[in-house]
């Protein structure tokens, strides 16, 4: 099972997602069985729904990039070590998402789809995926698409 601690910073998020905790509960329930590596494990992560100013500060502090971005991931484990964890209850890390960037990318049409793309991408980083090499990018992208198809029905 995968659970999210949801933190909301700013009022704009509630215009698009009335109850962020319920939103994540429904989405994560659908994908908890998706990862065979996670069978029998309880994963928890924190997601911060924030604004461009806050995410810009985080991006500058942790990635040395002085601009806002749609999503940042802070995995608790390296990609290789994640597979070796034997514990049943695992805190996998943190995700931050930016309202303004997601809203711009959605062209104000399908905000929730763009939001799902962002946090799913972040979640995959938390469970050990990356896109440094081309083959890893395509593998990660394929998994993102499968998850998005599953949760947007």
What are these regions (language model features)?
Residues 1-118, 124-153:
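An acidic/histidine-cluster motif and surrounding catalytic segment
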């Amino acid at each position: 099972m995968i659970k999210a601690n949801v933190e909301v910073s700013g009022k704009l998020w509630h215009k698009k997602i009335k109850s962020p905790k319920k939103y994540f509960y429904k989405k994560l329930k659908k994908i908890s069985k998706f990862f065979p590596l996670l069978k029998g494990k309880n994963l928890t992560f924190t997601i911060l729904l924030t604004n461009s100013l806050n995410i810009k500060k985080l991006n500058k502090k942790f990635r040395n990039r002085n601009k806002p971005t749609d999503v940042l991931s802070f995995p608790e484990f390296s990609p290789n070590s994640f597979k070796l964890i034997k514990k049943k209850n695992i805190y996998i890390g943190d995700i931050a998402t930016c309202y303004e960037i997601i809203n711009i990318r959605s062209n104000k049409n399908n905000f929730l789809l763009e939001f799902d793309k962002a946090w799913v991408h972040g979640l995959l980083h938390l469970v050990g995926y990356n896109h440094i090499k081309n083959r890893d990018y395509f593998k990660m992208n394929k998994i993102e698409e499968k998850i998005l198809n599953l949760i947007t029905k």
